């Protein structure tokens, strides 16, 4: 075409620059001078200005943000006056007209206030003007930075010449943007024209508005709902993007980014690329039906994609400048431009091989259109949000458009900026544009920039014609799609037929062996592709050894987890197919699956073994394999190399999925390997999964949609992630799992998706595939705006899905015909799949007609196993000769091939929560379960998430029916309501009229309610009542809480009844799911329980405690630990207020020769185990020695246990006392076994390979209910370290912070005394910025330095925690400080002028915490205490209690010790203070301690609050305890007691729910005294061995002390240890002791099973760390810490107040 023939630039773009140094110019610095006394207006900087401010103050001498406007003025012009006098006159007028040109910029003296600008009164404003006559003078004047606090933001330069003058307006970008410069050009031309002719319209002396009003309006905007909506949009623009990483071919050999502190400042180079005429720009825009700038932005995105790296299915973003100027500010000069990131959808290359340039441009244009509506949102706020949530906050390429200037005598020199590449379009006067590129020459060579230019010109020409607009993106050189896997092309049906999914996964193991294949953050487990390949090979060899081969079926009766994946692929590799037998199915359902599938091998695990025992007894399979392992045939004895392929055919079976069937038996759908391969191959363009993408396994493996999760994810090279509790994957728990595992993609049914809280950020989640049932339009609209939503449709019989429709973020009216609901749009068929609409005679209808959907193609399955008649009915050959499946779904096809779905044709087959159900099958099960039932009608309930059954006659016991039905039907097939009525409506043929039942459900329910129905009772149970067990023979049991227990039980039972819509009361032994519950109803149950009892429970809590009884215990324990005023007592014995009773001895267990349980498979054993688990709410491992009380049982639970045992073993009639005395499992089996005739299990030999899962760290045990606390901020001053980084560095490098100091030289010494002139000192201890705290100087001089320094470190710690205090509001922060005595008072040289205050200074001295609360403006509790060296840990415990009881939401815990006078000390050998001036804990040379000073603070929150707030966490505090030694085993008050200390450690460990083997390290008090160290370690060993039952042979616990580094910091010492422990957890390593040469004989580490920390100790994620602090006199404290979740770990850097305020006032005795 004629356009775009010559793209060479008509003129050059340049900017006023050399390097960013001003070679001959005076250096510029920011002086932060005060505003002029003639200031007329003060306003905070706008958010856009603040983003530039941070760059400015770091390098005020830089010219990177200088924006220059040039005028070339002819002095002889007839159009305007170009004289110097006219120029100066115009400058003066504009300075008075525009407040921004006469403003100065300043940092606030209050760090909580933003920087501001001060507008000088126009009467006192004087512009900065230079008149120069040489180029050198011009360069010196122009190439300088700004001192914005003095000079203002603009510098005028007049370059004189004979016939012309040049005017330069050099402005800082913080004050003006490109549109303001355009406005300024117009106003200067207007003024000069007016001065020439006195006829042009003169400008008004002031503007209609001012920039200050805009700043205030912007601040107001940040508090509006529209701001939150905009944040949501902008988050979507950076979600799923990564910073651009340039290809190495583009970069210099050693690219360097010079900082602005070097002598050669960072600078940029400008390259003018091309010119575009108005006609060319118009044609460009018309071709793509959008603006030319949007087309250009899209092409720049493609250009950058070609020359950069990016991960699979990730996008990139460009900063695009938006005007963001309000209409009322049109004539105001200021910085309105807002550069914001626009997503460039590079992932389109992977989403579709046929992705077209036109579609790509359209996506970018949509993003820009939406961005224009939200252009007011500040970029700096988005960056902060991105950093908090782990999103991309780094943008290296910018695109901008500067509108045309007033005349061709004007030129604009753009800013250089800080981007790697800055594409700048300047509008020409004729409407054309010039493109220039400003780039970083330290990164790119000129040749690389030339390559970019050539490629961009090629892209422009590539985009010219309509034919090119429809070309594939991949056809452009360098933009080929990144493939998930090396599978055949989609058109090669034969090649896909030959593929095998397990072979494709094997390809990934070859390509990326170290890539994560399987992962679980909760379980702390993962497997790489290489490890998965090896494990599946071993399991395949095992199957082959057991007889597995082609044609066989392996039944997988496994828990949801890694094992299921291993054995699925092992079955494939062995040549067999697999079928999943869900462990939750009833025996009759499992029996049907075993029988229909003809499985000869069954694989199970230890968790699922109990529910499979009957099948083993009945020999339902030839071979049973357990993953639990045995010494005979462990799986790791099998080879890791692949099996030899026995040869395969096209129709080899891959798996059998069982669905509901109308005959009363499940239907087994047989899917062959080639059908599975076709689905996985066809889904590649629609499923956003690939290398480095994390997908969550949400669905049950018995549900065919799970294939999309485990097959597609692993074939495409992604990472498949698992939750610990799959059944609980709804609501907040699902969101928690997404965040913890950093999930990018998940598959869910609409029922599950509807529970996912849309208010949660979930920053890593990029896409969701939803299907399995009808999805409400509201759910689609909610999530399509947040993520890429994929709407899936496909019957099980056609292999998972036949359409995968990617929904646009907003409904496009052009794409949706009138009257079409978005929820009915399923999209177009997958490649090689055909969908037809047929009438009842199976004639294919034209598009647009409604009928039954029929599906053909290579994904159509083999059919149903052993159901020939049904196969003939559902699978047929259509008129085109294609094998076709009749789906039973009603729909139509639009002209473009889009499939619309309108539901089922047969309303007796429905979908509930993703499961396809034949209602007739359930009705047959009901009649089989109870022969009294004459007629039955099962319907979907009103909400569509459950079933409702009506039965006749009204005398049917509905609860007995439900219990009987549980023997035949899976949980999801059991109606949540069964209502008995007198009659059901019938047809003329005397059959139940199900349509009328559906229509009249409300009336039938009302009739059933009037008639009444049976309650939810177990067969041997009685209705709920207050328990009243006989007490005559158990007087030793305290049952005073029974009435309260019964009240709580009755309340929870009523909640269940309401949630389940049950007709009668519910008893404690019924499980929630057996009573008709499901995972969706758990949401309602959770809300009701939390509302009724005022406690917080998690989804996993409710899944683990699934009966009324266990939930009562859960609620009781939560209320007991929460300190709530509405306390409901737990099972535990209430504390008596009278004399403390003696410890109750454990009842002795009668001797028994039954000392070992053979695999817990005996009926008696299994029954008792189940009862224990239900009563205790315990789900761990049980063995013969398991003790009821040691597992958490109490005397109050014995009557419950006794009652349950009598129900199970009614013939035994054992007394409650006997049960009480038989405390172990073995004893109760022995006690009750004699009353049971069932023989003990005698299993035949089974192959039992060991677990194949490779775990890098052991599984973390699931935590019982407990409160944890998070350390989210810290700061401190320590000997030898003034910041936290310095503190850590000193510890890591084992340096000594104790230093030499003078003093006491003239003090008299006793016979054995020595003067030691060493001490742990704080640097600059006497310096304090009183002005910063707005404190009178004289008052500050008298203030205890402990208070001064605590003010600073408390504020720094709060800042480190991201907590900004409101100086005008009520800050809900509590302050708890352990502090030493104020010794400064006596040495203070400055006295108060108030005589009364001087006389009573001891009484008038405010506490450290009170002083901090005043100056920090906090309103929470404040406490200062002194328990000697344990003070800070005691303060920590009080702070935790304040959080637990709701007194405050944030606590600042402090420790302070600064002792005056600052001098050495006098001591003598054998005393507590060292004669050598060195602290050496545990060393043979240790001789005491050395005094040390420290002031430090940590910020703690409740862990749940910290995680919800997105805080970065150093460590969790799991438990803490304080105690006293008493006097019974102490020779004196100053001697520590090991037993007193052990008691405190025990209580802290119990509160933390920690076991000794979990403790990797303990930071002990370790004062360096021989006796003190020995007694302390003795106490630690007593706690672990005698109180907590540490087993022999466990790893020795590491012990360390920081006293060798800092000395004994007295009241602060415990918090110093906490900070060290928290940093150790955060960094994953414990620093070693400073100095340990020879272990002293006073410490027997081997006997104590402890080890000194000689070397750095690596910590794993599950390791815990203890901290002990011992106060003189017997006040002891112990704390247990652990690691937070990986996504909450601390990553940000520390800031210190002294870095922000370096000018410090000396305050001390010397002054």
Curated annotation (Swiss-Prot):
The modification O-(pantetheine 4'-phosphoryl)serine is found at residues 1079, 1195. Residues 1128-1140 have a biased composition (Basic residues). The keyword Transferase applies. The gene is TAS1. One of its GO terms (cellular component) is cytosol. The active site is at residues 1429, 1565, 1608. One of its GO terms (molecular function) is 2,3-dihydroxybenzoate-serine ligase activity. Its EC number is 6.3.2.50. This is Hybrid PKS-NRPS synthetase TAS1. It comes from Botryobasidium botryosum (strain FD-172 SS1).
């Amino acid at each position: 075409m004629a356009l775009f023939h010559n793209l060479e630039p008509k003129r050059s773009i340049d900017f006023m620059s050399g390097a960013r140094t001003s070679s001959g110019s005076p250096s510029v610095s920011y002086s932060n001078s005060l505003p002029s006394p003639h200031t007329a207006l003060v306003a905070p900087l706008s958010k856009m200005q603040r983003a530039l401010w941070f760059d400015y103050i770091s390098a005020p001498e830089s010219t990177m943000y200088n924006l220059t406007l040039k005028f070339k003025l002819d002095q002889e012009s007839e159009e305007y006056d170009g004289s110097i006098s006219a120029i100066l006159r115009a400058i003066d007028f504009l300075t008075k007209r525009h407040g921004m040109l006469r403003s100065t910029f300043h940092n606030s003296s209050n760090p909580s206030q933003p920087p501001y600008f001060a507008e000088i009164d126009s009467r006192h404003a004087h512009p900065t003007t230079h008149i120069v006559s040489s180029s050198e003078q011009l360069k010196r004047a122009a190439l300088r930075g700004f001192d914005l606090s003095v000079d203002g933001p603009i510098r005028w330069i007049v370059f004189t010449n004979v016939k012309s003058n040049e005017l330069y307006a050099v402005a800082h970008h913080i004050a003006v943007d490109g549109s303001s410069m355009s406005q300024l050009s117009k106003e200067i031309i207007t003024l000069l024209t007016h001065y020439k002719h006195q006829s042009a319209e003169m400008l008004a002396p002031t503007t209609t508005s001012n920039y200050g009003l805009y700043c205030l309006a912007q601040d107001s905007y940040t508090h509006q709902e529209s701001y939150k909506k905009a944040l949501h949009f902008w988050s979507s623009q950076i979600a799923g993007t990564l910073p651009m990483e340039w290809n190495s071919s583009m970069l210099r050999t050693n690219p360097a980014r010079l900082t602005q502190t070097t002598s050669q400042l960072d600078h940029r180079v400008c390259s003018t690329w091309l010119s575009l005429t108005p006609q060319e720009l118009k044609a460009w825009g018309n071709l793509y039906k959008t603006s030319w700038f949007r087309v250009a932005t899209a092409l720049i995105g493609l250009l950058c994609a070609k020359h950069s790296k990016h991960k699979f299915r990730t996008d990139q973003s460009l900063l695009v400048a938006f005007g963001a100027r309000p209409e009322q500010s049109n004539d105001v000069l200021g910085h309105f431009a807002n550069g914001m990131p626009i997503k460039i959808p590079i992932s389109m290359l992977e989403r579709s091989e046929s992705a077209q340039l036109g579609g790509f441009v359209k996506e970018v244009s949509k993003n820009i259109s939406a961005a224009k509506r939200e252009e007011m949102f500040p970029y700096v706020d988005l960056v902060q949000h991105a950093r908090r949530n782990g999103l991309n906050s780094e943008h290296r390429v910018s695109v901008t458009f500067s509108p045309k200037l007033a005349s061709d005598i004007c030129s604009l020199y753009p800013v250089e900026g800080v981007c790697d590449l800055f594409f700048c379009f300047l509008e020409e006067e004729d409407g054309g544009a010039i493109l220039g590129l400003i780039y970083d020459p330290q990164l790119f060579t000129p040749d690389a920039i030339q390559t970019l230019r050539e490629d961009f010109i090629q892209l422009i020409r590539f985009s010219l014609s309509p034919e090119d607009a429809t070309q594939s993106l991949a056809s452009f050189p360098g933009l080929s799609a990144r493939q998930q896997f090396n599978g055949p092309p989609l058109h090669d049906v034969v090649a896909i037929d030959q593929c095998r999914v397990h072979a494709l996964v094997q390809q990934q193991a070859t390509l990326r062996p170290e890539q994560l294949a399987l992962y679980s953050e909760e379980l702390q487990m993962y497997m790489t592709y290489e490890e998965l390949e090896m494990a599946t090979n071993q399991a395949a060899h095992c199957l082959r050894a057991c007889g597995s081969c082609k044609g066989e079926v392996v039944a997988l009766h496994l828990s949801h987890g890694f094992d299921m994946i291993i054995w699925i692929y092992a079955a494939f590799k062995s040549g067999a197919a697999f079928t999943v037998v869900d462990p939750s199915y009833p025996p009759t359902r499992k029996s049907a699956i075993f029988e229909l599938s003809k499985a000869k091998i069954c694989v199970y695990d230890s968790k699922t073994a109990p529910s499979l025992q009957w099948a083993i007894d009945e020999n339902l399979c030839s071979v049973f394999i357990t993953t639990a392992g045995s010494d005979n045939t462990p799986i790791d004895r099998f080879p890791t190399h692949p099996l030899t392929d026995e040869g395969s055919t096209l129709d080899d079976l891959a798996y059998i999925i069982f669905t509901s069937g109308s005959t009363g038996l499940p239907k087994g759908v047989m899917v062959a390997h080639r059908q599975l391969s076709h689905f996985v191959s066809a889904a590649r363009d629609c499923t956003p999964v690939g290398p480095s993408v994390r997908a969550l396994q949400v669905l049950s493996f018995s549900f065919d949609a799970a294939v999309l999760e485990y097959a597609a994810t692993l074939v495409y090279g992604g990472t498949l992630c698992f939750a610990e509790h799959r059944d609980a994957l709804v609501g907040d728990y699902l969101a928690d799992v997404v965040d913890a595992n950093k999930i990018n993609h998940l598959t869910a049914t609409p029922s599950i998706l509807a529970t996912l809280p849309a208010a949660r950020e979930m920053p890593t989640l990029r896409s969701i595939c939803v299907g399995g049932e009808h999805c409400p339009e509201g759910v689609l609209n909610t999530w399509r705006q947040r993520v890429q939503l994929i709407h899936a449709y496909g019957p099980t019989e056609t292999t998972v899905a036949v359409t995968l429709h990617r929904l646009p973020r907003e409904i496009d009216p052009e794409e949706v015909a009138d009257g079409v609901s978005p929820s009915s749009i399923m999209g177009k068929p997958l490649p090689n799949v055909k969908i037809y609409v047929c009438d009842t005679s199976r004639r294919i209808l034209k598009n647009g007609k409604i009928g039954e959907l029929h599906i053909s193609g290579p994904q159509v399955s083999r059919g149903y196993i052993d159901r020939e008649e049904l196969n003939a009915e559902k699978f047929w050959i259509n008129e085109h000769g294609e094998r076709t499946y009749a789906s039973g779904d009603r729909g139509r096809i639009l002209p473009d091939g889009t499939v619309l779905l309108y539901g089922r044709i047969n309303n007796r087959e429905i979908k509930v929560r993703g499961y396809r159900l034949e209602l007739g099958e359930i009705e047959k099960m009901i009649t089989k379960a109870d022969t009294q039932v004459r007629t039955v009608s099962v319907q979907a309930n009103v909400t569509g998430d459950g079933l409702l059954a009506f039965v006749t006659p009204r005398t049917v016991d509905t609860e007995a029916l439900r219990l009987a039905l549980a023997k035949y039907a899976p949980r999801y097939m059991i109606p949540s309501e069964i209502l008995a009525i007198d009659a059901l409506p019938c047809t003329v043929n005397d059959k139940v009229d199900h349509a009328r039942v559906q229509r009249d459900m409300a009336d039938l329910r009302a009739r059933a309610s009037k008639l009444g129905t049976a309650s939810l009772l177990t067969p041997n149970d009685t209705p709920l009542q207050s328990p009243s067990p006989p007490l005559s023979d158990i007087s030793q049991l305290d049952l005073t809480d029974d009435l309260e227990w019964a009240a709580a039980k009755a309340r929870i039972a009523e909640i269940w009844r309401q949630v389940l819509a049950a007709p009668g009361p519910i008893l404690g032994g019924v499980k929630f799911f057996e009573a008709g519950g499901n995972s969706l109803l758990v949401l309602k149950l959770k809300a009701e329980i939390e509302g009724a009892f005022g406690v917080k429970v998690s989804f996993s809590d409710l899944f683990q405690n699934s009966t009324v009884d266990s939930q009562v215990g859960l609620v009781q324990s939560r209320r007991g630990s929460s300190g709530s005023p509405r306390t409901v007592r737990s099972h535990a014995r209430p504390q008596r207020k009278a004399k403390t009773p003696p410890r109750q001895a454990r009842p002795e267990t009668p001797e028994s020769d039954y000392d070992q349980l053979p695999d817990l498979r005996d009926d008696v054993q299994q029954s008792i185990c189940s009862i224990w688990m239900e009563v205790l709410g315990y789900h761990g491992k049980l063995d013969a020695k398991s003790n009821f009380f040691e597992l958490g049982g109490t005397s109050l639970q014995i009557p419950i246990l006794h009652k349950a045992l009598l129900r199970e073993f009614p013939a035994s009639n054992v007394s409650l006392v006997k049960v009480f005395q038989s405390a172990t499992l073995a004893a109760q089996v022995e006690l009750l076994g004699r009353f049971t005739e069932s023989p003990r299990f005698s299993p035949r030999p089974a192959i039992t390979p060991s677990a194949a899962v490779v775990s890098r760290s052991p599984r973390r045990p699931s935590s019982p209910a407990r409160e944890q606390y998070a350390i989210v901020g810290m700061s401190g001053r320590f000997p030898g370290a003034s910041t936290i980084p310095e503190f850590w560095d000193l510890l890591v490098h084992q340096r000594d912070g104790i230093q030499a100091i003078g003093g006491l030289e003239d003090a008299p010494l006793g016979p054995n005394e020595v003067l030691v002139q060493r001490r742990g000192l704080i640097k600059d201890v006497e310096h304090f910025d009183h002005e910063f705290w707005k404190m009178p100087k004289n008052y500050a001089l008298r203030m205890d330095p402990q208070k001064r320094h605590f003010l600073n470190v408390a504020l720094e710690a709060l800042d480190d925690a991201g907590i900004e205090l409101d100086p005008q509001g009520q800050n809900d922060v509590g302050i708890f400080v352990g502090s030493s005595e104020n010794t400064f008072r006596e040495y203070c040289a400055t006295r108060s002028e108030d005589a009364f205050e001087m006389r009573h200074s001891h009484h008038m001295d405010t506490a450290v915490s009170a002083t901090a609360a005043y100056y920090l403006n906090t309103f929470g509790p404040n406490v200062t205490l002194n328990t000697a060296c344990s003070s800070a840990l005691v303060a920590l415990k009080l702070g935790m209690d304040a959080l637990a009881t709701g007194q405050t939401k944030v606590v600042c815990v402090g420790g302070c010790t600064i002792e005056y006078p600052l001098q050495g000390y006098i001591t003598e050998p054998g005393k507590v203070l060292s004669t050598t001036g060195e602290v050496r804990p545990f060393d043979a040379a240790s001789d005491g301690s050395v005094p040390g000073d420290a002031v430090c603070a940590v910020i703690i929150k409740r862990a749940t609050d910290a995680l919800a707030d997105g805080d970065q966490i150093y460590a969790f505090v799991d438990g803490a305890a304080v105690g006293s030694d008493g006097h019974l085993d102490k020779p004196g008050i100053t001697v520590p007691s090991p037993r007193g200390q052990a008691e405190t450690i025990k209580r802290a460990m119990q509160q933390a729910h920690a076991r000794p083997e979990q403790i990797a390290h303990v930071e002990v008090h370790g004062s360096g005294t021989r006796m003190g160290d020995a007694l302390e370690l003795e106490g630690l060993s007593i706690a672990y061995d005698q109180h907590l039952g540490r087993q022999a042979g466990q790893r020795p616990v590491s012990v360390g002390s920081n006293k060798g580094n800092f000395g004994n910091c007295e009241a602060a010492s415990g918090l110093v240890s906490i900070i060290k422990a928290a940093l150790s957890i955060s960094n994953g390593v414990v620093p070693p002791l400073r100095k340990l040469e020879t272990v002293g004989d006073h410490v027997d580490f081997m006997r104590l099973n402890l080890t000194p920390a000689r070397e750095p100790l690596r910590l794993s994620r599950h390791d815990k760390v203890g901290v002990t602090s011992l106060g003189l006199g017997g006040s002891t404290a112990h704390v247990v810490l652990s690691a937070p979740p990986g996504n909450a770990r601390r990553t940000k850097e520390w800031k210190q107040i002294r870095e922000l305020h370096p000018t410090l006032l000396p305050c001390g005795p010397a002054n």
